[in-house]
Amino acid sequence: MTLDLIKIRRDLHQIPEIGLEEFKTQAYLLERIAEMTEGKDFVEQRTWRTGILVFLHGSAPEKTIGWRTDIDGLPIVEETGLDFKSIHEGRMHACGHDIHMTTALGLLDQMLQVQPKNNMLFLFQPAEENEAGGMLMYEDGAFGDWLPDEFYGLHVRPDFKVGDIATNTNTLFAGTCEVLVTFKGKGGHAAFPHEANDALVAASYFITQVQTIVSRNVDPIQGGVVTFGSFHAGTTNNVIAETAEVYGTIRTLTQEMSLLIQKRVRQIAEGVAASFGMEVDIMLKQGGYLPVENNPALAKELMAFFDASPAVNLIDCLPAMTGEDFGYLLSKVPGVMFWLGIDTPYALHHPKMSPNEEALAFAVSEIGKFLKYKAED
C-alpha cells in the first residue's frame, strides 16, 4: 500500500503522550500496522505495555535485523501555531518522535512488499524521554527470541539539511546520569548561627568543589559534563536552612568516565557533609541512558552505503552530549544510530520546533534501500 506520510505524521503530531502513557499513539500505530500487514502470513506482532514489536519472518533467515523508533512526547506547551498542533494540553512532539514513527511505518511498509530473506524486527518503543523504555523492555523479556542480531535507529537533527545523514564509527550520544544530593543540617534563627548547622552553606561548598571534577579528574581528551541546574534551600531571609537540595546531570562519552565522575561526586558530597558534621543523601540515577556507542564495523558499512547514494549527503560527525536510551539496547546488541536532517531553525525540545516534512520521503526512500540491502545480505 502507499502511505500518506504527511497525514500520518500530522495525525501523530496532534496526540503526543508522556512515556508509558502513549495509549492513543499505540492505538493509532496498531491500526496502521494492521492495515499494512493484512494478508501477510510471514508477520507476527506483540505488544508490551504501550510498545509494539512487529516481526517479519525471513524466507531463509541467517540473522535478524532490527529497526527501532521511539514514540513518546514531551511535557511542553506547543507554540508552533500549526493547524495540526497538539490537542493534548501541555504535551508536544518537540523531539521529532512523530517523524521517527512515521519513518518507521514507511520503512515497515516497504519491507512488507516482498518477504525478506532475513528476519526483521520493527520496534516501536515507549518512554525514551523519561523511563528508558528500551531497558525496561529488555529487562522484562519483551523481545524473547525476536532479539535482533543488529539494531539500527535514527534521531532527527534540526541544524542539518534534508538529505543529510550523519553518524560516526564510535560514540554518537553521551550517556547521562541524574544527580540529586540533599544535605541535612540543623535549622535555626539567623541571629544564632552557632546553634544551627547551615545546609545551604554546605551545599554551596559542594557546588564549587564539584567544578574540579572535569578540570582535574577527567582526561581532557575524553571530556565530560557535570552541571547542577537546580538548588533549593531555605524558606525566608532570617531562617537558617535545615536542608539543601541540588539537582544536576552528568554526561560522558564512555561508561567508564561516567562511573568515575559518579564516584567523585559521591566522594565530594560525603566529604563536604563530614566536614560540616551533617548527613547527606546521594541519588545517582543512570538507568538505561548509557552512551550510544556505534559498532565500528556496522557503522563503516552503513556509512559506505549512504556515501554511495547520490541523494545522501553523508556527514562524519562528532559526538553530541545529548542523551538517548538507545544506548542501552546498543550495549546488548551491535548496531548503529544516526542523525537525520530536518532543517528547522528551532532546537530539539523547543516549543516552536517544526521539522521540514520533506525529510519523510527522503528517509523512507534512502533508509529503505539500506534495510532492503541488510534484509538480503
From Swiss-Prot:
<dbReference type="InterPro" id="IPR023905">
    <property type="entry name" value="AcetylDAP_deacetylase"/>
</dbReference>
<protein>
    <recommendedName>
        <fullName>N-acetyldiaminopimelate deacetylase</fullName>
        <ecNumber>3.5.1.47</ecNumber>
    </recommendedName>
</protein>
<dbReference type="Pfam" id="PF07687">
    <property type="entry name" value="M20_dimer"/>
</dbReference>
<dbReference type="InterPro" id="IPR002933">
    <property type="entry name" value="Peptidase_M20"/>
</dbReference>
<feature type="active site" description="Proton acceptor">
    <location>
        <position position="129"/>
    </location>
</feature>
<dbReference type="InterPro" id="IPR011650">
    <property type="entry name" value="Peptidase_M20_dimer"/>
</dbReference>
<feature type="active site">
    <location>
        <position position="70"/>
    </location>
</feature>
<dbReference type="InterPro" id="IPR017439">
    <property type="entry name" value="Amidohydrolase"/>
</dbReference>
<dbReference type="InterPro" id="IPR036264">
    <property type="entry name" value="Bact_exopeptidase_dim_dom"/>
</dbReference>
<keyword id="KW-0457">Lysine biosynthesis</keyword>
<keyword id="KW-0220">Diaminopimelate biosynthesis</keyword>
<dbReference type="Pfam" id="PF01546">
    <property type="entry name" value="Peptidase_M20"/>
</dbReference>
<comment type="pathway">
    <text>Amino-acid biosynthesis; L-lysine biosynthesis via DAP pathway; LL-2,6-diaminopimelate from (S)-tetrahydrodipicolinate (acetylase route): step 3/3.</text>
</comment>
<dbReference type="GO" id="GO:0050118">
    <property type="term" value="F:N-acetyldiaminopimelate deacetylase activity"/>
</dbReference>
<comment type="function">
    <text>Catalyzes the conversion of N-acetyl-diaminopimelate to diaminopimelate and acetate.</text>
</comment>
<dbReference type="GO" id="GO:0009089">
    <property type="term" value="P:lysine biosynthetic process via diaminopimelate"/>
</dbReference>
<keyword id="KW-0378">Hydrolase</keyword>
<dbReference type="GO" id="GO:0019877">
    <property type="term" value="P:diaminopimelate biosynthetic process"/>
</dbReference>
<comment type="similarity">
    <text>Belongs to the peptidase M20A family. N-acetyldiaminopimelate deacetylase subfamily.</text>
</comment>
<keyword id="KW-0028">Amino-acid biosynthesis</keyword>
